């Protein structure tokens, strides 16, 4: 069995292979703890994300499986890449990815961003989204803390745990409130890749202003703040609301006029204002796409249609509609991990995490 080393991080057991050393906490979210470490095989810094109790519920099992499937298949310069994955003897799952020094949230709280950085960061976000959306995938939880940046200003989108195949009947209350598209709040269904463009528009506005554009205290307040800028939703948008209660609520609100963006924003850059306005269209059907946004004049310094690739094929995530028991998700997860390491499921030998040679791994300790 592979050699595992125990460490306590914020009172949480980190049980990793001896391939990784020098663990330091980076951040903690609702579904996992992230540490930085050194990969002794490559001498490179990495990020190790522990998925806590991935098999505690079918919902969490599916979420973890979904994120693994995405990270395995998405290969793009502006999307975080998976370099290793293993399951510890205690059946926690660890994703190992490249380490970037900071995230956009930390940058925005530290200092105002200059125009060239705003342009470059926005360009990279949209470049990544063009690829993801071309595969029929919606991220669903874009926010500054999910946008990683290194010292060279290279940017990568991370945290695909909530991502889904584009589905005209997609449901659920998902993204962080400040960056949540109005169609999610209004209908909870019938939304698509346009929700990511809204979130990116909110991030773009935050880079321009230095603070969140729509800092709602709850979903009602969030919607109210949005209408203070964009005005009352058009009638054809209101008519798409499926919930009768939500429809009555929206129709009961006083009519609000739209505020010109040049009165709301500090920037006097007309190209920036034009692009953010196109990204924050109330109607997702008229919202600009990632591909269209990349070609906008505001991003002309970086736009290169020959270097903005799309996915070779759509992802087949038919499992997303499956209601499976935990044990089935576990078997599927093990299969994906074996496939990631290019090892036949029929074999009992697995590469040692510490270098050349093979060792037999237990059912709960897959690694390389």
Curated annotation (Swiss-Prot):
Residues where ATP binds: 26-34, 49
Keyword Cytoplasm carried by entry: yes
Record's note on what induces expression: By hyperosmotic and hypo-osmotic stress.
Subcellular location: Cytoplasm; Nucleus
Active site: 141 (proton acceptor)
One term of GO molecular function: ATP binding
Post-translational modification: Phosphorylated. Dually phosphorylated on Thr-171 and Tyr-173, which activates the enzyme. Rapidly dephosphorylated upon either hypo- or hyperosmotic shock.
Phosphotyrosine: residues carrying this PTM: 173
Domain of life: Eukaryota
Gene Ontology biological-process annotations: stress-activated MAPK cascade
Listed EC numbers: 2.7.11.24
UniProt catalytic activity: L-seryl-[protein] + ATP = O-phospho-L-seryl-[protein] + ADP + H(+); L-threonyl-[protein] + ATP = O-phospho-L-threonyl-[protein] + ADP + H(+)
Cofactor: Mg(2+)
GO CC annotation terms, alphabetical: cytoplasm; nucleus
Motif (TXY): 171-173
Modified residues (Phosphothreonine): 171
Activity control, per UniProt: Activated by tyrosine and threonine phosphorylation.
Family matches, as SMART domains: S_TKc
Broad EC category: transferase
Major site of localization recorded for this protein: cytoplasm
UniProt record similarity statement: Belongs to the protein kinase superfamily. Ser/Thr protein kinase family. MAP kinase subfamily. HOG1 sub-subfamily.
Function comment: Mitogen-activated protein kinase involved in a signal transduction pathway that is activated by changes in the osmolarity of the extracellular environment. Controls osmotic regulation of transcription of target genes.
Protein name from the UniProt record: Mitogen-activated protein kinase HOG1B
Organism for this UniProt entry: Wallemia ichthyophaga (strain EXF-994 / CBS 113033)
């Amino acid at each position: 069995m592979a050699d595992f080393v125990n460490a306590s991080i914020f009172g949480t057991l980190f049980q990793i292979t001896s391939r990784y050393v020098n663990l330091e906490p980076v951040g903690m979210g609702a579904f996992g703890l992230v540490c930085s470490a050194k990969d002794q095989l490559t001498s490179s810094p990495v990020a190790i994300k522990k998925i806590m109790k991935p098999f505690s519920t079918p919902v969490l099992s599916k979420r973890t499986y979904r994120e693994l499937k995405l990270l395995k298949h998405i290969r793009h310069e502006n999307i975080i890449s998976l370099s290793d994955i293993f399951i510890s003897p205690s059946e926690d799952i660890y994703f190992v990815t490249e380490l970037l020094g900071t995230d956009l949230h930390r940058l925005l709280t530290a200092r105002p961003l200059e125009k060239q950085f705003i342009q470059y960061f926005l360009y990279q976000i949209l470049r990544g989204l063009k690829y993801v959306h071309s595969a029929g995938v919606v991220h669903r939880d874009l926010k500054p803390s999910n946008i990683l940046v290194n010292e060279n200003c290279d940017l990568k989108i991370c945290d695909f745990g909530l991502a889904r195949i584009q589905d005209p009947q997609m449901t659920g209350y998902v993204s962080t409130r400040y960056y949540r598209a109005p169609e999610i709040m209004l209908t909870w269904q019938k939304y698509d890749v346009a929700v990511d463009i809204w979130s990116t528009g909110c991030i773009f506005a935050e880079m321009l202003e230095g603070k969140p554009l729509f800092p709602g205290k709850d979903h009602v307040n969030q919607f109210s703040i949005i209408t203070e800028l964009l005005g009352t939703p058009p009638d054809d948008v209101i008519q798409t609301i499926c919930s009768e209660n939500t429809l009555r609520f929206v129709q009961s609100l006083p009519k609000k006029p739209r505020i010109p963006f040049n009165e709301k924003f500090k920037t006097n850059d007309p190209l920036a204002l034009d692009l953010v306005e196109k990204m924050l269209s109330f109607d997702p059907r008229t919202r600009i796409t990632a591909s269209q946004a990349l070609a906008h004049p505001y991003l002309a310094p970086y736009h290169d249609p020959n270097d903005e690739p799309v996915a070779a094929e759509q992802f087949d995530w038919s499992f997303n509609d499956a209601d499976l028991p935990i044990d089935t998700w576990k078997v599927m997860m093990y299969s994906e991990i074996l496939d990631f390491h290019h090892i036949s499921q029929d074999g009992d030998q697995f590469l040692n995490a510490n270098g050349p040679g093979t060792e037999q791994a237990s059912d709960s300790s897959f690694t390389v």
